[in-house]
Curated annotation (Swiss-Prot):
InterPro entries given in the database record: Betaine-hCys_S-MeTrfase_BHMT (IPR017226), BHMT (IPR051524), HCY_dom (IPR003726), HCY_dom_sf (IPR036589)
Protein name per Swiss-Prot or TrEMBL: Betaine--homocysteine S-methyltransferase 1
First-level EC class: transferase
Subunit details: Homotetramer.
Domain Hcy-binding: 11-314
GO molecular function (one): betaine-homocysteine S-methyltransferase activity
Cell location: Cytoplasm, Cytosol; Nucleus
Enzymatic reactions: L-homocysteine + glycine betaine = N,N-dimethylglycine + L-methionine
Length: 407
């Protein structure tokens, strides 16, 4: 089973990766906590770190028990400009500093219960979408960075960027701390929203100072690994080296467009039929490892049992199973204890590996048509505002949606 925490100094993220160790990330906090009633869909901001620290702490612990050895601070969308965007007054009522500090404290507490590191994370900003300057956008990142340095996180992650330009600015801002920086973009094989290829994105991120590059969110494991492969090829062609990282969705998205699952009509409240099984994730973990990815985790939709699947699949390489495997038989082997004989007959790898999963929805399509509005930085509808969205603005969007649906 997984090694317990101790008083010894932990190896850093680059020391671990350079030695060939497999790093297992955590899963999707905002989706998991929204379902549990602690995060509001829409703004997706992390004030739960202050308002409900016990919920955030418990989710960290479940990921740790499942095999994660990185506790990523719950600071997704915790920039000051996001916390006061479109009627979200968290910055005014609580303050961005308190949210970021609380998230760091919780992550450190849980990380020290095991052999885990703490990663401070920043993500894309309303300031960039509103065409603010490089200096202004970097200042937003620097506000969070000040907290991460004060709380002495082990390394930093710039994640969930749709535009490589902003991701580069984030990496440059974070690199000033002297701590290792990882950078992941929420892009598919077509590249970022300005059509910069995945290979070129990776090159720019490494040149900006990132030691670890890859993708997170927006796309399923299969598509995400296709993108990581393109990043790897781009780095090799440029003669650059970096560790590879993958933290995809736990939803199947073969029908999504360039912006990924946020274009799907089911986003965010109808995605459950698309959830990946634990066996899907074991397959993803093996394919990621074979591609050369050594930082393997998940994003939205990834629950602790998905992370456990990664840890179990890669247990031979890591040398141990996670603590959560104490209550989980490999490939369903624990089903041999079931009272019903047909269930006991499912206690084998061959059954679950080859099962074609039914949705139970006989009149529903298996694929959707993405909305594909095609908006990006500078588009009027993406210009952000401090005030809440008005009724008139909503009516205009409703009419546009009707028009798009009729096309």
């Amino acid at each position: 089973m997984a090694p317990a925490g101790g008083k010894n100094v932990k190896k850093g993220i680059l020391e671990r990766l350079n030695s060939g160790e497999v790093i297992i990330g955590d899963g999707g906090f905002v989706f998991a906590l929204e379902k549990r009633g602690y995060v509001k869909a829409g703004p997706w901001t992390p004030e739960a770190a202050v308002e409900h620290p016990e919920a955030v702490r418990q989710l960290h612990r479940e990921f740790l028990r499942a095999g994660s050895n990185v506790m990523q601070t719950f600071t997704f969308y915790a920039s000051e400009d996001k916390l006061e965007n479109r009627g979200n007054y968290v910055a005014e009522k609580i303050s961005g500093q308190k949210v970021n500090e609380a998230a760091c404290d919780i992550a450190r507490q849980v990380a020290d219960e095991g052999d885990a590191l703490v990663a401070g994370g920043v993500s894309q900003t309303p300031s960039y979408l509103s065409c603010k300057s490089e200096t202004e956008v970097k200042k937003v990142f620097q506000q969070q960075l000040e907290v991460f340095v004060k709380k002495n996180v082990d390394f930093l992650i710039a994640e969930y960027f749709e535009h490589v330009e902003e991701a580069v600015w984030a990496v440059e801002a974070l690199k000033a701390s002297g701590k290792p920086v990882a950078a992941t973009m929420c892009i598919g094989p077509e590249g970022d929203l300005h059509s910069v290829t995945p290979g070129e994105c990776a090159v720019r991120l490494v040149k900006a100072g990132a030691s670890i590059v890859g993708v997170n969110c927006h796309f399923d494991p299969t598509i995400s690994l296709q993108t990581v492969k393109l990043m790897k090829e781009g780095l090799e062609a440029a003669g650059l080296k970096a560790h590879l990282m993958s933290q995809p969705l736990a939803y199947h998205t073969p029908d999504c467009g360039k912006q990924g699952f946020i274009d799907l009509p089911e986003f965010p409240f109808g995605l459950e039929p698309r959830v990946a099984t634990r066996w899907d994730i074991q397959k993803y973990a093996r394919e990621a490892y074979n591609l050369g990815v050594r930082y393997i985790g998940g994003c939205c939709g990834f629950e602790p049992y998905h992370i456990r699947a990664i840890a179990e699949e890669l247990a031979p390489e890591r040398g141990f199973l996670p603590l959560a495997s104490e209550k989980h038989g490999s490939w369903g082997s624990g089903l041999d204890m079931h009272t019903k004989p047909w269930i006991r007959a499912r206690a084998r790898k061959e059954y679950w590996e080859n099962l074609q999963i039914a949705s139970g929805r006989p009149y529903n399509p298996s694929m959707s048509k993405p909305d594909a509005w095609g908006v990006t930085k500078g588009t009027a509808e993406l210009m952000q505002q401090k005030e809440a969205t008005t009724e008139q603005q909503l009516r205009e969007l409703f009419e546009k949606q009707k028009f798009k649906s009729a096309q």
